[in-house]
């Protein structure tokens, strides 16, 4: 019988960790590719498949597989989907065009050229996640449906030592690679209307017949990144995290699907933005279920990886929750207007629904609560925040202050604009939201005081050494022209002003990553890192900006050996942390 570690208050006992799963080794072979995918084209990749045994099917399974394939080609693709125009949010010609198109894997390239001077204090690796479909879509495809790929640049001693990009070897990716085509449903791009119902039935039939194995997870791990307890975790909210190791030569190696040593259910999930407390080392997280209750759960892990008991958060319907916030003592959980209604597919619509009758609200819960008895809801009318950048407690007023970007229309990322002209223009307004859990009253205001300076701000961060505490600055992507990112803004949350760094004509990037200088006294003493792509030249680089300088000057740019597609979220792992990897 496995021994158990002593249980801390509110924590479930933890079984002795099993040995780590075997590493995934990837053999590489250079294959030229322009990174473009055409509908129906064969996939192109830089890496050869990992050496792994092929799935062996018995004669009945082979017969079932052939029958299901015939139904897919004849009924679903041939009848339900043929001739149907795709919305822009599900059209591969839009979603993976230009620099959104996927690239192949690349093993470490060493000795990268640098213009300017790299600060010696940047000692570690910058890693950024993103969606990068291995196979050409067979039907609808949304950017968020792509397989997760990590891009990593190793910096040390004022040098850019290496660059590499690798797929996160999810169970889904490995099975689809073996089969040579996509067989798992694409949650946003495919699950619309009757064809979406049909594709869910195809998936269920393949799983039931043993043609594919859904028990090992169905996620793509393409969104968030966090480094906790010696592990870099790649995440998307449709699965458990995946543990990825940065090797000594700057490569990326998938260790496997990570359940925190059996503390998370094998069929469970964790959202893409868990919160790491910089003081205690605890990791706080949510998990939502779109089918059955409890629809939402809250839990946390100690610095050494011991999990708390789940707290069931009472919500009336399955709700899309991509992000949340923590303060020193509380978790702030949004329950907003984007909900899941799977029955809408039967009526020909999308299961991701903007519920105009629902009142947006935020739940305030003690961070280490054992149950939801102390949860307090505060309504915030007309508010949908896809991301929350920080939160803290205002001792003078008793309020919880939340900094987030309020998006309109709320479903802009997922669905086509409505027929209402006033709702067709996308806006993402940086907002200060004040919650009073004692009275249930909220206040909201735009952070940028000058309306003429208002820009769409989405994707970014504060100084993560101050997460959950009051911060003065936030570093956020300027999402203009939407969905491209033309630069980033350093926003002064106190004065309501912003200093902007624009990448230049025809140059676009993504989320800015703020890296504080070791031992810095000033909150903004550090550098902002971001991948930037020149669409005219077809080149990509890692731009380094001095965040503390008056004009936010670019101090260096690392020339990268290949195109880096526009992606999602990133993190910086210091050299000392790399040495302590599990």
Swiss-Prot record:
A GO molecular-function descriptor: metal ion binding
Keyword Glycosyltransferase part of the UniProt annotation: no
Annotated transit peptide: 1-64
Positions of disulphide bridges: none
EC number from the UniProt entry: 1.13.11.51
Disordered: region residues: 1-53
GO biological process per UniProt: abscisic acid biosynthetic process; carotene catabolic process
Comp. bias intervals (Low complexity): 1-14
Cofactor requirements of the protein: Fe(2+)
InterPro entries hit by this protein: Carotenoid_Oase
UniProt keywords, alphabetically: Abscisic acid biosynthesis, Chloroplast, Dioxygenase, Iron, Metal-binding, Oxidoreductase, Plastid, Stress response, Transit peptide
UniProt induction comment: Induced by abscisic acid (ABA) and salt. Induced by D-allose. Induced by infection with the bacterial pathogen Xanthomonas oryzae pv. oryzae (Xoo). Induced by drought stress.
Similarity comment: family membership: Belongs to the carotenoid oxygenase family.
Job of this protein: Has a 11,12(11',12') 9-cis epoxycarotenoid cleavage activity. Catalyzes the first step of abscisic-acid biosynthesis from carotenoids.
Protein name according to UniProt: 9-cis-epoxycarotenoid dioxygenase NCED4, chloroplastic
Gene that encodes the chain: NCED4
